[in-house]
């Protein structure tokens, strides 16, 4: 080997993961990153890199972890569209995958770790049957395990499907399309940390079995990562958690504890927040003294936060009422309204305590469908759900712009919650857009969106299979003691150990999302959470059904009316015409919108039913076959020496030979007919070339 050649000796490990072989490779690519892994799962290849900054952390009270997941079009052998011909801002799929990676790894960084960490997952090659999200999650876990950054992993991750009553590990895209379940689960060797799923009204027991099945199956990935890290991992950073400042904790408790306990018994969120904020300011002002005690404002703030957590959690575990006075199983007071906006196609306001959403549904035609240029291929999405979380909903000011990751994630969760009960395109050929405007928020606005969406769609006349509702559960756990909380507040979410969101109908679960911050969540705890969630969901559904319990039979007068018909695909060109002239004239003259699929399904949209019927009639004429023996009312289009051409259907002319004009002898065609004359003709013959022979004489004889 010459001296100019560089020797790369990557370390590889492989394992069987369902129907796919997975290979992890490190040491050959991106060697300047703290950790870098190439993951190959049946030709879907993802490069995951991790870099952590070792310089002293700035004064901050959070972990500055950034996760970027990026899909390159070359991975699927394609060139990007658009003027610049390069990838643009992250797609919804990329944003959701970033969240999917972030959620299970964030709780595994040690408490007090404040160094900046960046994860970048890049899809380099795509098998269009294998989603890149699971390889990206496994690669992130492996790269962190190799990096030496303090991390209490590794984690494993897998997708679980449900086909023919059996669980399927890491189903392909084709299998997922047929599956009753699409569930992604991630966790450590001992505990489940995250679940993201949608289901076709499955029972709670099946959902729980799927979570535990996935956790069991992912152990092979965790073992392989441990094996890879043992051979190729870097030394663990020499990082020590900041020492507990017990004297500061005691000083804060002595100063504000009794007042803080009283503040956390104020039911009104804004009043409580103002009181807690004032107590925090009091503690900082009284105790922050860098020169004398060495306590900065940030240190006092951390100690105050620790005391808050102790007070709220301690009261709940001791059996005292929650912050707003409820017991652990009570849903907040509800207010349900449907049909609240006069000109929209469907609308609802759903209020649960201090969480409220105005949800509006709009019906459109096929041309309104969202075109998604996904890596695995282009597709059209006929159902959209958008979630907006403006700053005023929590009493704050802030920047209004493009949707943030959280808004995209919450919108997707709400969409998962209702997708199982949506009608098929054949049952309801409209494109549907739902927008949720969160107008108040104190916990679980995504589940309020699920409830509001169901109400709004029913108000719009969309034939849902069932009414659906969603609820968020929480958990407080200390040692063997635990309390499962129904319909959590924002503070309970922030100070608790689990966020467990469940959506569904009275018959089963449609969506389940779970984020767990601690180890030790047992089957018993998850069963209790699902059981309480079902009780809460049924209570909410009962209240919703009192307002509207089935889709309205009459749609809004402002919604478009759709007529559908099927034509021979070979006749599509007759409807469209040369350069689109025919269909353009048809839409302008009737005031309708017309969409034609490649299969010959014609959808006519108009707010005026009569106009839609007129367009349908014209299309039937354009595509009708000429019947031999049938009499048509036609118009003379052109005179010739040997006869006249008569238009009997749009675009269809036939010849009346001079001998077929009259029973009397005709010497000159112009003596009997003029262009534009209306005549009745009978079809005598259509030859192999499609030429039509007509007769006026045969009509006279009849």
Curated annotation (Swiss-Prot):
Tagged with keyword Phosphoprotein: no
Major localization class: cytoplasm
Cofactor: Mg(2+)
Localization of this protein: Cytoplasm
Domain KH: 560-619
Protein role: Involved in mRNA degradation. Catalyzes the phosphorolysis of single-stranded polyribonucleotides processively in the 3'- to 5'-direction.
Family, as annotated: Belongs to the polyribonucleotide nucleotidyltransferase family.
Species of origin: Halorhodospira halophila (strain DSM 244 / SL1)
CDD domains: KH-I_PNPase (cd02393), RNase_PH_PNPase_1 (cd11363), RNase_PH_PNPase_2 (cd11364), S1_PNPase (cd04472)
Pfam families reported in the protein's UniProt record: KH_1, PNPase, RNase_PH, RNase_PH_C, S1
Catalysis: reaction(s): RNA(n+1) + phosphate = RNA(n) + a ribonucleoside 5'-diphosphate
GO biological process, one term: RNA processing
One cellular component (GO) term of this entry: cytosol
Every S1 motif domain range: 629-697
Binding positions for Mg(2+) per the UniProt entry: 493, 499
GO MF annotation terms: 3'-5'-RNA exonuclease activity; magnesium ion binding; polyribonucleotide nucleotidyltransferase activity; RNA binding
Source domain of life: Bacteria
Name of this protein: Polyribonucleotide nucleotidyltransferase
HAMAP family noted in UniProt: PNPase
């Amino acid at each position: 080997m010459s001296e100019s050649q560089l020797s790369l000796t990557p370390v590889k490990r492989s394992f069987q993961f369902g129907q796919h072989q997975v290979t992890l490779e490190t040491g050959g690519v991106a060697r300047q990153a703290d950790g870098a892994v190439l993951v190959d799962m049946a030709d879907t290849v993802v490069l995951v890199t991790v870099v952590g900054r070792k310089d002293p952390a700035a004064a901050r009270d959070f972990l500055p972890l950034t996760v970027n997941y990026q899909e390159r079009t070359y991975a699927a052998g394609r060139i990007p569209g658009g003027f610049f011909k390069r990838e643009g801002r992250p797609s919804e799929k990329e944003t959701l995958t970033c969240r999917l990676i972030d959620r299970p790894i964030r709780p595994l960084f040690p408490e007090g770790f404040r160094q900046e960490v960046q994860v970048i997952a890049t899809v380099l090659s795509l098998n269009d049957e294998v989603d890149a999200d699971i390889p990206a999650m496994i690669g992130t876990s492996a790269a962190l395990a190799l990096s030496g950054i303090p991390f209490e992993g590794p984690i494993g991750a897998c997708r679980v499907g449900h086909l023919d009553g059996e669980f399927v590990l890491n189903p392909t895209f084709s299998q997922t399309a047929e599956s009753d379940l699409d569930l992604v689960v991630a966790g450590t060797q001992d505990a489940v940390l995250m679940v993201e799923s949608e289901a076709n009204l499955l029972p709670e027991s099946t959902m729980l079995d799927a979570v535990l099945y996935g956790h069991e199956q992912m152990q092979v990935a965790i073992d392989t990562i441990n094996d890879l890290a043992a051979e190729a991992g870097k030394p663990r950073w020499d990082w020590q958690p900041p020492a507990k400042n017990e004297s500061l904790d005691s000083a804060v408790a002595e100063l504000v504890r009794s007042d803080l306990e009283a503040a956390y018994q104020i039911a009104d969120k804004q009043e409580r927040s103002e009181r807690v904020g004032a107590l925090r300011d009091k503690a900082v002002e009284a105790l922050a003294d860098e020169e004398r005690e060495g306590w900065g404002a940030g240190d006092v703030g951390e100690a105050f936060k620790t005391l808050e957590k102790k007070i709220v959690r301690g009261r709940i575990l001791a059996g005292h009422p929650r912050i707003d006075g409820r017991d652990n199983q009570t849903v907040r007071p509800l207010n349900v309204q449907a049909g609240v906006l006069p000109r929209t196609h469907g609308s609802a306001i759903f209020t649960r305590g201090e969480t409220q959403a105005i949800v509006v549904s709009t019906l459109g035609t096929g041309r309104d469908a969202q075109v998604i240029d996904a890596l695995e291929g282009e597709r059209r999405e006929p159902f959209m759900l958008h979630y907006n979380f403006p700053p005023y909903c929590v009493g704050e000011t802030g920047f209004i712009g493009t949707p943030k990751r959280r808004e995209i994630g919450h919108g997707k969760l709400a969409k998962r919650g209702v997708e199982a009960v949506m009608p098929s395109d054949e049952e309801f050929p409209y494109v549907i857009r739902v927008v949720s405007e969160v107008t108040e928020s104190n916990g679980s606005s995504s589940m309020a969106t699920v409830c509001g969406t169901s109400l709004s769609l029913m108000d719009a006349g969309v034939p849902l299979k069932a009414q659906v509702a969603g609820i968020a559960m929480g958990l407080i756990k200390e040692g063997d003691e635990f309390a499962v909380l129904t319909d959590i507040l924002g503070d309970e979410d922030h100070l608790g150990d689990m966020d467990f969101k469940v959506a569904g109908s009275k018959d089963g679960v449609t969506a389940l999302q779970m984020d767990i911050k601690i180890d030790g969540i047992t089957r018993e705890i998850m069963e209790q959470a699902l059981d309480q969630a079902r009780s809460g969901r049924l209570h909410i559904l009962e209240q919703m059904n009192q307002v509207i319990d089935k889709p309205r039979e009459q749609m809004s007068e402002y919604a478009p009316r759709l007529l559908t018909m099927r034509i021979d695909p070979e006749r599509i060109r007759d409807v469209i015409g040369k350069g689109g002239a025919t269909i353009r004239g048809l839409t302008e003259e009737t005031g309708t919108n017309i969409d034609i699929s490649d299969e010959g399904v014609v959808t006519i949209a108009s707010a005026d039913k009569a106009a839609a019927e007129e367009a349908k009639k014209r299309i039937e004429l354009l595509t009708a076959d000429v019947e031999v023996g049938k009499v048509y009312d036609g118009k003379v289009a052109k005179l010739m020496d040997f006869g006249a051409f008569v238009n009997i259907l749009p675009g269809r002319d036939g010849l009346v030979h001079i001998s077929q004009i009259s029973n009397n002898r005709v010497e000159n065609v112009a003596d009997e007919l003029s262009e534009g004359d209306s005549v009745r003709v009978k079809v005598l013959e259509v030859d192999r070339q499609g030429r039509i022979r007509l007769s006026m004489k045969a009509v006279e004889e009849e």
